[in-house]
């Protein structure tokens, strides 16, 4: 058995890299032979699980797992003779707390000492507690065999508990089944649901401390527990921000599913972990080794300093105005009136003599509603002549308001000026638009009214803070409840908060209910509450807003990205959703967010590059598993499973494209690839010490068959001599390289056969490539090449019979250097992509959890985010990655969709675009609009056909007008007028709910169409085409698919795991991410979030537009079939009208296969049909006229020809392949 193990697992010593009790790798395990002291390394937990499964049964034949599966077989076969006996071995496994969980065990003599004190029955409820908690002897040990299969103990936690509580030192090894001191008992538990551990607490040493990990409820701020147990320190941890954290423990057993070591490994803000000397004999954590593979230059490389980023510089505009006196006069008058309004409301507080009443209100409220004063005054200043006031006038206005109010208070002045900055950066047009939101009621001084509002607000605050009798989370909350409880003077409330308005045209009365305007009747309580007469409104549109609107958190300002108190001066009847929340943590820095979006374009390359390394690691792991079942066991199903798994990996690697093939070469044999790049340059470049700008590298071409053969031998065979010979197939034409290689080689085999391989390199590459391409199981190659003589004799015989063939152009990797440079660039930018252990997939991973961890480690680790909680970073990243997964990591589509979704919080449809989401079933389309439904006001309508006629009730029509997004699900057909009406930006309409009066609304919704089948739009034209943004998805989220360990695998197969409750899991993350998009992706001047032009230059979107157009319009179909294109004047080409008509005749023969099935049904009676309803015939004259109209700038009426136009001029050149949506 020892000789077999030496072939499977390499020996390691007790040096620093493989020190005993040193936690340096979450996957590696070490087996020790206690007789000889030999330590053997298993590179992956899977190797140990395969080894354990193979030796679990000491009987002949199938392993224990497959014996259970085959118990119902009727056939009786003679059992094969056992190849190896496992009984009585001396193997033990060293502890690794990431993957070593066991049934509780300890030496019999130790158990006898503590059995009266060890109480484990409290962790289970059982019908038969004695059976569950029974402890039995096995050899020299005692263990608990009847625990549930999903329950275990952390071996490290078990060691610590026994040592701290009882002073028992347990060896840091676990005996393996059939160990002579244990017997046929398997102590290991893999992936337990819960496990016993010693109670621990990891908290920072800050004030107040931040808890990073707890697994129990003990208060560790106490030095000693009530039971007398002392609190011990286990680790001291240094953090990235300079703080420290301490891991404390107490000798209590707890049952949990939380692993401290996973927190220490995964939290990117923890940099160094030092174990207390007292416990180093049990555990010693090396964070660097735990997080990074050892590779050339990785350990000794100094930390890379982040690139210098130029500071953001904003020019400061000097204030000036020809109307300075007018502005100052209006400010002075306004402040007097505002103060008067406040004094009337606040008479109860004796503040009428306070000259700084308004200033006190602003300062104490944190300038919460300071902007209301700016809106009001500026609106009065500019109401007669807006064009005379520019940015300099606005800047002067802000400075004069602030100086007039806070000229004697420098701190308040600075704060007020900062509050004005968002408007100065956007420009005067945006500020004018903001002020237009503010409604000034006729018949009342707007400043006095604002003063009454301020006074009522201040009144509530003073009342709530004057006594403990009032319980309130936020004393500044201005709402119905606080206004009534604080008994604000009713007259002030009626005038400035619960404002009553009446539409004089429709006689509809509305009252502001503390959040938004509500239609009321005379017998409603809200109507009776307000005794003042209603303000008369005429021809007023409600919800006519762009930058400010009511929300359940107050009035939201898109420009400042902040909330004001509820106020009645915005005429809105609804509360749109917003992505920002008042209690959200601070945004990530703009540089971090910009880095996230900038990385989007190369994420597929990043994931593909990682996927190559993952495949190679899997090959090494499966090779060991195959060797284990071949050499140690007789289980035929296990052997077949391993062979099939290895063969699947081989086929995936064998079928890689050129780009991935070169990346694979860099991982498998980086030095050889660099040799190729150097030795295939021109002579001048090879001789030069300094890099030269030469195009020779672009001419490097490598025999693809030879390269693939080299990589397969390097990776699967791993024979150094054969590998060296195989690489000579590539370097065969470089005599200097071959001669140098023969001088330095110490292999007689290489020296003997090098000439043969270089001379016949083309034939050898072709033969081996053909054999590998046809091979049934790749492990047969691994067996065949073990006999060098036989293998080389076969090659010589095959070469002799192989006909000579000239090198084929299609058998060359023509862009070798471009692929090499691309891979090298990715690996340089993301240096930890191949060497970070944290991003390796774990058994507990879902696709979402792995992808988030990968992004945090690989992408965000390049940015300084150490001051942000990991939970918040995770939330932003999860929201971002949702859009990537939904589009199968299509950069352009995901980028547009995230901007479209973010634009919904700016309540105006400035895009004139409808987003159309066709796709296969289960591609995630429903999840997209379900997420939006949680976040914004959505009106959803399910119908397959829409014409111009209304299909909804009046209540639903009003709901649609009040919504932020209008979603039509499973729409199959619609009219051109219906589509344009809802896709356009101007959508005002007068509607009424049932039993309520008519009101005029400004509709701010954007249109979203979702379906599985292609959409048919009747009377499709250029106007319809220009209003579409199309994102097609053809991947699926399936319940039976499991995460493979690499997202790129799912990108390729277009099959993703279907995760349950995904909307609930993602809604907060998507919201937080979209809040960042709104914050940082707005246009500088307008403050709007752009989305309509983001796909203009995307070739996939242009193709999908063509596909939609061809499917809906005969004219577009003819243009596509005939490939009609405009040409530059210099081309001097033309097509006669006669030829055009002739080719249109040929095209009409294929039109029906291009057009939507509904086309003939809906157009049977129209003039485009030259036949009958039953027999549809296209009118070629009408089609010709449509072509003339489409290319009117090219058509020459006098010459009856089309100038500067190219097209198919015969039947053989026409395109009869119907385009399909693609992504």
Swiss-Prot record:
Q: What is its main location?
A: host cell
What is one cellular component GO term in this UniProt entry? host cell nucleus
In which residue ranges does the UniProt entry place its DNA-binding region annotation?
A: 967-981
Q: Which GO terms describe its molecular function?
A: ATP binding; ATP hydrolysis activity; DNA binding; DNA helicase activity
List the subcellular locations. Host nucleus
Q: What is its EC number?
A: 3.6.4.12
On the tree of life, the source organism's domain of life is Viruses
Q: What is this protein called?
A: ATP-dependent DNA helicase P143
Q: Which organism is it from?
A: Orgyia pseudotsugata multicapsid polyhedrosis virus (OpMNPV)
Task: Name the gene.
Answer: P143
């Amino acid at each position: 058995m020892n000789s077999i193990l030496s072939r499977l697992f390499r020996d390691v010593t007790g040096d620093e890299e493989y020190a005993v009790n040193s936690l340096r790798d979450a996957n590696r395990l070490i087996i020790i032979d206690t007789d000889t002291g030999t330590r053997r390394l298993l590179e992956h937990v899977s190797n140990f699980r395969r080894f354990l499964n193979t030796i679990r049964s000491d009987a002949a034949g199938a392993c224990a797992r497959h014996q259970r599966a085959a118990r119902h077989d009727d056939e009786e076969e003679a059992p094969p003779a056992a190849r190896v006996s496992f009984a009585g071995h001396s193997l033990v496994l060293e502890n690794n707390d990431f993957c070593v969980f066991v049934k509780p065990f300890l030496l019999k003599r130790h158990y006898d000492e503590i059995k009266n004190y060890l109480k484990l029955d409290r962790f289970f409820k059982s019908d038969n507690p004695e059976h569950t908690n029974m402890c039995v002897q096995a050899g020299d040990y005692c263990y608990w065999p009847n625990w549930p299969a999903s329950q275990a103990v952390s071996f490290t936690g078990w060691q610590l508990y026994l040592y701290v509580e009882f002073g028992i030192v347990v060896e840091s090894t676990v005996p393996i089944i059939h160990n002579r001191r244990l017997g046929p008992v398997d102590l290991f538990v893999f992936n337990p649901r819960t496990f016993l551990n010693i109670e621990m607490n990891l908290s920072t040493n800050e004030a107040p401390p931040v808890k990073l990990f707890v697994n129990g409820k003990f208060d560790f701020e106490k030095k000693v527990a009530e039971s007398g147990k002392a609190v011990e320190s286990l680790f001291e941890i240094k953090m990235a921000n300079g703080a420290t954290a301490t891991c404390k423990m107490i000798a209590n057993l707890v049952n949990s599913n939380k692993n401290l070591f996973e927190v220490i490994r995964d939290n990117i803000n923890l940099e160094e972990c030092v174990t207390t000397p007292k416990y180093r004999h049990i555990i010693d954590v090396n964070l660097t080794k735990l997080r990074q593979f050892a590779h050339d230059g990785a350990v000794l490389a100094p930390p890379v300093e982040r690139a210098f980023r130029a500071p953001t510089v904003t020019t400061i505009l000097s204030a000036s105005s020809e109307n300075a006196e007018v502005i100052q006069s209006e400010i002075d008058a306004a402040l007097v009136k505002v103060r008067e309004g406040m004094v009337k409301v606040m008479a109860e507080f004796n503040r009428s003599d306070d000259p700084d009443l308004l200033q006190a209100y602003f300062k104490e409220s944190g300038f919460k509603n300071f902007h209301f004063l700016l809106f009001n005054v500026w609106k009065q200043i500019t109401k007669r002549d807006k064009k005379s006031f520019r940015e300099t006038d606005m800047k002067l206005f802000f400075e004069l308001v602030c100086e007039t109010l806070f000229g004697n208070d420098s701190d308040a002045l600075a704060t007020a000026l900062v509050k004005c900055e968002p408007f100065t950066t956007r420009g005067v047009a945006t500020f004018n638009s903001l002020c237009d939101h503010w409604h000034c009621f006729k018949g009342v001084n707007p400043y006095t009214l604002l003063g009454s509002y301020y006074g009522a607000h201040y009144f509530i605050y003073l009342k709530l803070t004057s006594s403990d009798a009032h319980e309130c989370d936020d004393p500044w909350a201005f709402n119905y409840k606080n206004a009534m409880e604080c008994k604000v003077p009713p007259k002030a409330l009626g005038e400035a908060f619960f404002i009553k308005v009446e539409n004089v045209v429709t006689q509809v009365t509305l009252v502001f209910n503390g959040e938004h305007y509500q239609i009321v009747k005379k017998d409603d309580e809200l109507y009776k509450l307000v005794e003042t007469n209603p303000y008369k409104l005429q021809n007023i549109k409600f919800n006519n807003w762009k930058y400010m609107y009511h929300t359940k958190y107050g009035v939201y300002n898109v420009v400042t990205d902040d909330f004001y108190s509820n106020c009645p001066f915005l005429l809105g009847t609804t509360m749109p959703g917003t992505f920002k929340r008042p209690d959200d943590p601070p945004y990530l820095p703009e540089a971090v967010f910009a880095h996230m979006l900038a990385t989007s374009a190369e994420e597929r390359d990043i994931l593909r590059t990682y996927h190559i390394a993952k495949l190679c690691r899997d090959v090494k792991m499966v090779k060991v598993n195959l060797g284990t079942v071949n050499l140690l066991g007789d289980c035929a199903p296990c052997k077949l499973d391993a062979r099939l798994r290895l063969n699947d990996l081989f086929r995936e690697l064998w079928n890689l494209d050129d780009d991935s093939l070169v990346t694979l070469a860099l991982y498998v044999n980086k030095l050889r690839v660099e040799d190729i790049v150097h030795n295939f340059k021109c002579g001048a470049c090879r001789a030069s010490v300094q890099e030269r700008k030469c195009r020779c590298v672009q001419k490097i071409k490598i025999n693809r068959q030879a390269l693939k053969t080299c990589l397969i031998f390097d990776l699967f065979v791993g024979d150094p001599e054969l590998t060296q010979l195989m690489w000579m197939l590539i370097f065969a034409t470089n005599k200097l390289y071959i001669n140098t290689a023969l001088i330095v080689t110490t292999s007689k085999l290489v020296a003997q056969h090098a000439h043969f391989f270089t001379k016949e390199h083309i034939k050898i590459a072709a033969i081996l490539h053909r054999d590998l391409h046809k091979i049934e199981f790749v492990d047969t190659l691994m067996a065949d090449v073990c006999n060098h003589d036989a293998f080389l004799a076969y090659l010589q015989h095959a070469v002799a019979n192989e006909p000579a063939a000239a090198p084929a152009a299609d058998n060359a990797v023509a862009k070798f250097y471009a692929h090499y440079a691309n891979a090298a660039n990715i690996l340089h930018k993301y240096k930890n992509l191949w060497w970070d252990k944290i991003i390796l997939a774990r058994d507990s991973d879902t696709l979402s959890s792995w992808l988030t961890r990968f992004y945090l480690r690989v992408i965000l680790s390049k940015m300084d985010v150490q001051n942000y909680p990991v939970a918040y970073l995770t939330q932003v990243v999860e929201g971002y990655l949702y859009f990537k997964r939904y589009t199968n990591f299509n950069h352009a589509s995901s980028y547009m969709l995230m901007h479209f979704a973010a634009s919904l919080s700016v309540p105006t449809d400035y895009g004139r675009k409808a987003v159309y989401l066709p796709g296969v079933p289960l591609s995630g389309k429903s999840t997209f609009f379900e997420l939006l439904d949680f976040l914004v006001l959505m009106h959803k309508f399910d119908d397959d056909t829409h014409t111009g006629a209304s299909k909804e009730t009046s209540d639903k029509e009003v709901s649609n007008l009040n919504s932020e997004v209008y979603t039509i699900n499973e729409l199959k057909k619609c009219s051109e007028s219906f589509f344009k009406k809802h896709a356009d930006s101007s959508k005002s309409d007068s509607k009424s709910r049932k039993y309520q009066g008519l009101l005029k609304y400004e509709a701010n919704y954007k249109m979203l169409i979702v379906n599985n089948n292609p959409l048919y739009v009747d009377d499709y034209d250029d106007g319809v085409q220009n209003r579409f943004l199309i994102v097609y998805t053809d991947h699926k989220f399936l319940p039976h698919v499991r995460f493979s360990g690499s997202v790129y695998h799912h990108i390729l197969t277009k099959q993703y795991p279907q995760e349950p409750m995904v909307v609930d899991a993602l809604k907060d993350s998507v919201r937080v991410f979209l809040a960042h998009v709104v914050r940082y992706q707005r246009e500088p001047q307008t403050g709007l979030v752009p989305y309509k032009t983001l796909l203009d230059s995307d070739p996939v979107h242009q193709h999908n537009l063509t596909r939609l157009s061809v499917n809906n319009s005969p004219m577009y179909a003819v243009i596509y079939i005939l490939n009609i294109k405009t040409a530059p004047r210099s081309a001097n080409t033309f097509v006669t009208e006669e030829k055009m008509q002739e080719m249109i005749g040929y095209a009409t023969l294929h039109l029906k296969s291009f057009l939507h099935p509904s086309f003939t049904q809906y157009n049977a009676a129209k003039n485009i049909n030259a036949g009958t309803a039953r027999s549809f015939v296209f009118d070629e004259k009408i089609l010709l006229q449509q072509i003339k109209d489409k290319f009117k700038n090219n058509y020459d009426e006098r010459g009856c020809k089309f100038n500067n136009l190219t097209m198919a001029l015969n039947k053989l050149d026409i395109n009869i392949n119907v385009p399909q949506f693609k992504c």
